[in-house]
Amino acid sequence: MKKSSSLALGNFFKTKKQILKADIQKLIKTNQINYVDPKHGTALNRAIKLKDEKIITELLAKKVDINEAIYFAIGHEYTLEEIKTLISLSSSELPDEYLYKAVHQGRLDLVQYFIEEKNFDVNTTINNPLHGGAILSIATMGEHIDVINYLLKNGAIASQGVISAILKGNIEILEKLFEYGATAHDGYSEDLVALLVNAAIPANDPTYCKSSNSETKEDLSNYVETLKFLLEHGGNPNAEFLERGTVILIALSALMDEPKNDTYKDICKLLIQYGADTSKFKSYTETINNLKKEIIEDMKVVDKSDFKDEGYVSDSAEADQLSKKGSKLVDTSSKSVFFSLEEIIEKNPTTLGGETDIVKSEFFNS
């Protein structure tokens, strides 16, 4: 019985090979050797899978499009050796699109091959209308961590991936890019804080979600963490985004529309905390003051002694522990402005009221 089953299985695979060969011969006879089948690719792709040198030679003699076959192979999980075989058949210079496709697919083995053996530049920029840009940016959009690490370790310019990391709301990748030299001020086409706020707020808009992939609460919290990271590293809390205005205006308007939206609230609080100018938004005074109250409560301000010249440090055991651990909130080496008590009290009085001198003073640059 086992012998019979093995024979039947062998016949099945033999038949499959015969079918592929028959398909190739049909394509040759009908002069369609470069037709790209969605599953099998061109006639040359089939021949490579069959490892049939005779058919490969025949196809080459008929001027088969090798580049088309290579491109298909990269996008369809061909092995590195199969792709190397295809490339060995070509005498022309390899186009950047091969590297783009390998990066887009997250094929670290191919990325290494193209860079180390075929001398592609680690900072290659792809001219593609849909997914163009530096290959590090493309890897970041795909969140291919192993490819990102490889590119950075081999000299990729870290700032090339920053905007993609922000659009993806991926704080881990953003931190990695900053470790390799990226900053919040590297001459980007758009302000990073503005890009992030614009991305975060539509992503949490119910109308927006109906026509796109819905975001989870965890995904949205990534935007908040990413904003915090940017502000801690010198991001501009008064950034403007195209026709929408300043980021604090965008965030406050969204919060007024959805008062229970925690993401909008957290964005507003972070921007205010790091110096956003709210003095122009008189119609939002009550909301702004309530946010400042929450900031004070979050920071557990007890009295004036809680503020140091270079940053806020609570006298509570919990905050002290955070400080010792290097919490970014109390890190006095941060590039962002964090207000001292003297700076806060110098501001004009607010309508907050309250029980402490700090609450009675204007809070955070309004």
From Swiss-Prot:
Pfam family, one: Ank_2
Matches recorded under InterPro entries: Ankyrin_rpt, Ankyrin_rpt-contain_sf, Cul2-RING_E3_ligase_SR
Superkingdom, natural source: Bacteria
Keywords (A to Z) from UniProt: ANK repeat, Repeat
SUPFAM superfamilies named in the record: Ankyrin repeat (SSF48403)
Repeat recorded as keyword: yes
Coiled coil: none
Claim: Repeat is one of the keywords in the record: yes
ANK repeat start-end pairs: 39-68, 94-124, 131-160, 162-186, 210-239, 250-280
Protein's name in the database: Putative ankyrin repeat protein RBE_0601
Organism, as annotated: Rickettsia bellii (strain RML369-C)
